[in-house]
Amino acid sequence: MRCYFYAQKPGAPDTPGDGTVSFCLPELNISFRARYRGTSAACEYAALLALLEFVDINPKMFEGKTLEVFGDSFAVVNQVNDRLYCRKELQPLRSMAVGYRNKIPFILNWVPTAENPAQGAEL
């Protein structure tokens, strides 16, 4: 089952501010969107973590399915996949995502923003 996460925060990437996090599961017609305060990278991690928490608390919806998670954050995808350095301040968020991987088997891949349906997730 394909799942997508997305985050957007206006302004300078390393300056905390109000952003939007979202995820969607097109096959189940589920979308989620919420506000989150943090840097751009923290917002991107928050979107991934919100999706993984949803999967974790709804195991019957995903029973017997291969979970493919897609995000347009090159950094988050590659940090969680151990292919890119993760800054110290983001390591707790990365650790949470890796912790979910130990509970929920999922594949994490990058997708171009234009192909990410989570960017248009409805409230």
Question: What is each of the regions a protein language model found here?
Answer:
Residues Q8-D14, L49-L123:
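RNase H catalytic domain
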